[in-house]
């Protein structure tokens, strides 16, 4: 049976790890390379590294930080933020990323997913979907850090990008992000059921039970969290042990 993955997320702005509430009011949570190294040592299954200002401020992802992180971390590293072209994917893979995540660029041009997947393989192409609830059972994609509405249905878009070749969906509930009220389980389940690739649930973890719910109720293949780990509320080990106690297969060190 495939093990469920636990993924700490390092949101980076101006070279530092930050964790905001609903992408506003950022708090400094440390140096990204140090944080990644600590999570590697703590038993994280993967690390997700997102430059949250790259798209908004229209600058490329910080390749040097990726390179330094990859040199010191030996778990898979997913990198996103400001990724626009297959050349960006190539540069990040060369810098040491294992997977590269498209977000706003894929919404503007879903074919960029196909171009990147054709060249590098679906296994290293992630599509990040940031969505908000707009009506019962309906979720809409927002881009540029949640600042721009698109009118695009999140479930339909997930089907489209996986058909184009995305090997994984990183699904963030913008309504829940930073609130510690738990994942949007209905949305997570709807998208998990709609696609045949792994879905990473993101946005809203406040307790260890929320991680369990993402898998058992949301159908996610992996769960992502930031602030509960960054500020020492729980360790990766505690989270994994709690998930195992609830019948979820996890990798322990």
Swiss-Prot record:
GO terms for biological process: L-histidine biosynthetic process. Its EC number is 4.3.2.10. GO terms for molecular function: imidazoleglycerol-phosphate synthase activity; lyase activity. Keywords: Amino-acid biosynthesis, Cytoplasm, Histidine biosynthesis, Lyase. The active site is at 11, 130. InterPro entries: Aldolase_TIM, His_biosynth, HisF, IGPS_HisA/HisF, RibuloseP-bd_barrel. It catalyses: 5-[(5-phospho-1-deoxy-D-ribulos-1-ylimino)methylamino]-1-(5-phospho-beta-D-ribosyl)imidazole-4-carboxamide + L-glutamine = D-erythro-1-(imidazol-4-yl)glycerol 3-phosphate + 5-amino-1-(5-phospho-beta-D-ribosyl)imidazole-4-carboxamide + L-glutamate + H(+). It is found in: Cytoplasm. The keyword Lyase applies. GO terms for cellular component: cytoplasm. Pathway: Amino-acid biosynthesis; L-histidine biosynthesis; L-histidine from 5-phospho-alpha-D-ribose 1-diphosphate: step 5/9. CDD domains: HisF (cd04731). SUPFAM superfamilies: Ribulose-phoshate binding barrel. It comes from the Bacteria. It is an enzyme of class 4 (lyase). Its main location: cytoplasm. Heterodimer of HisH and HisF. Belongs to the HisA/HisF family. IGPS catalyzes the conversion of PRFAR and glutamine to IGP, AICAR and glutamate. The HisF subunit catalyzes the cyclization activity that produces IGP and AICAR from PRFAR using the ammonia provided by the HisH subunit. This is Imidazole glycerol phosphate synthase subunit HisF. It comes from Ruegeria sp. (strain TM1040) (Silicibacter sp.).
